[in-house]
Every structure is written in C-alpha cells, then in structure tokens.
C-alpha cells in the first residue's frame, strides 16, 4: 500500500491529476485537482489505494489529515470512495466536522450521494471522533450555512482558469461575476469553471 507520492505533476484535469514518480505517471483521483499545478517542482501527495472488481484506483490528498478524514468517511456504511471524495470537494473540512458534531443533517444531505439515512449514519459513526484532525476552514462553517460553502469551489475554478493559460488580470476581471454566480447558483467547481470560460470568451 502507498502512503504518499513525491514527484512532479504532469497533467491536471477536472477529475484527476497525473503525478510522475521515477519515470512512471500515476493517474490520481483527487477532490480538487486544480489545487495542483503542472511544473518541475516536486509535490508530496498522500495516497489511498482502493481495489474493486473494476480494478485499482488511486485517490490523492493534500496532507495526511485530509487522507485520514477520507478514510474515516469510507468507514461509514453507504459511503464509497467517490462519495467520500465528493464530500471533500467542498473544501471546508472543519465545517464538515462541525456539521457532524452538531448533527446537521441538512448540511450533510446537500452532498452528492448522501441521503437522510446516510447522513444519520455519518453522525452516528463519526460524531466526536474527528476532532483530532488538523484541518482548515476555507469557506463558511456549518454554523453559518445549511449547504456547503462555495468559496473553495470558486477558488479552485479561478486557479483552473489560470492553469488553462489565462492571465491573472483576465481572471480578475471575471472574478466578481463568478462570485455573484456562485452565490446565486450554489455552483460546484466544474460549473464555475464553465461559466468563467464563457465569460472570458466573450471578452
């Protein structure tokens, strides 16, 4: 089993990144691919290896605590790797832990693939068991909102636009419109990225 990879990111896509280690390129699924940038600088990516009847998949994480949170979610009945990854894509891990501790089912059921029964199971299995994880809040907390914050998704979309070759100045010109769009639509990273591309192509 892998603990982490240390290598260069050679490709970034909406669903995964490719990291090259000792001349071998690994396809790694990650919640927020645009957190990474293609370049010669070596990055450390924590890895969870999942084996199923469909083959082997690698899931990547920014640090050990994010990986630990993912693996805790996997221990909940009804949560598979892709569902756990979708939950982490919100980018507000402290808000997630707070929601679990407060039994905030409305917050939890807003994630893809999480129904009321699964939300209750998450609370039952994980309440009070995640407080030792060192995670940061990148958006609003569960106290402030009944649905996941869009701040993390917006940041990822803006980073993605720059990764696609748009200048910081061009991206800055559409940031305000994307902020408004995200607040009214509650959009995820891919939706915000598509809207950003549409706005930039109009210029």
Curated annotation (Swiss-Prot):
Residues 149-203 are annotated as: Domain III. Residues 142-148 are annotated as: Flexible linker. It holds the Pfam family HHH_5. Its main location: cytoplasm. The keyword Cytoplasm applies. Keywords: Cytoplasm, DNA damage, DNA recombination, DNA repair, DNA-binding. Residues 1-62 are annotated as: Domain I. InterPro entries: DNA_helicase_Holl-junc_RuvA_I, Hlx-hairpin-Hlx_DNA-bd_motif, NA-bd_OB-fold, RuvA, RuvA_2-like, RuvA_C, RuvA_C_sf. One of its GO terms (biological process) is DNA repair. It is found in: Cytoplasm. Belongs to the RuvA family. Has three domains with a flexible linker between the domains II and III and assumes an 'L' shape. Domain III is highly mobile and contacts RuvB. Homotetramer. Forms an RuvA(8)-RuvB(12)-Holliday junction (HJ) complex. HJ DNA is sandwiched between 2 RuvA tetramers; dsDNA enters through RuvA and exits via RuvB. An RuvB hexamer assembles on each DNA strand where it exits the tetramer. Each RuvB hexamer is contacted by two RuvA subunits (via domain III) on 2 adjacent RuvB subunits; this complex drives branch migration. In the full resolvosome a probable DNA-RuvA(4)-RuvB(12)-RuvC(2) complex forms which resolves the HJ. This is Holliday junction branch migration complex subunit RuvA. It comes from Lactiplantibacillus plantarum (strain ATCC BAA-793 / NCIMB 8826 / WCFS1).
């Amino acid at each position: 089993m892998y603990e982490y990879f240390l290598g260069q990111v050679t490709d970034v896509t909406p669903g995964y990144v490719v990291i090259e280690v000792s001349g071998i390129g690994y396809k790694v699924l990650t919640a927020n691919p645009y957190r990474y940038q293609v370049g010669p600088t070596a990055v450390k990516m924590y890895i969870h290896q999942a084996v199923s009847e469909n083959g082997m998949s690698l899931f990547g994480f920014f640090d050990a605590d994010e990986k630990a949170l993912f693996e805790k979610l996997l221990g909940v009945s009804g949560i598979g790797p892709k569902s756990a990854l979708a939950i982490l894509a919100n980018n507000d891990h402290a808000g997630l832990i707070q929601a679990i501790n407060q039994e905030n089912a409305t917050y939890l059921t807003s994630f893809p693939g999480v129904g009321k029964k699964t939300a209750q199971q998450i609370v039952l299995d994980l309440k009070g068991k995640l407080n030792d994880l060192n995670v940061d809040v990148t958006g609003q907390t569960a106290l402030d909102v009944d649905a996941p914050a869009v701040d993390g998704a917006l940041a990822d979309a803006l980073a993605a636009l720059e990764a696609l070759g748009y200048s910081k100045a061009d991206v800055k010109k559409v940031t305000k419109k994307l902020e408004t769009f995200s607040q009214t639509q509650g959009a995820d990273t891919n939706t915000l990225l598509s809207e950003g591309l549409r706005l930039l192509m109009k210029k």
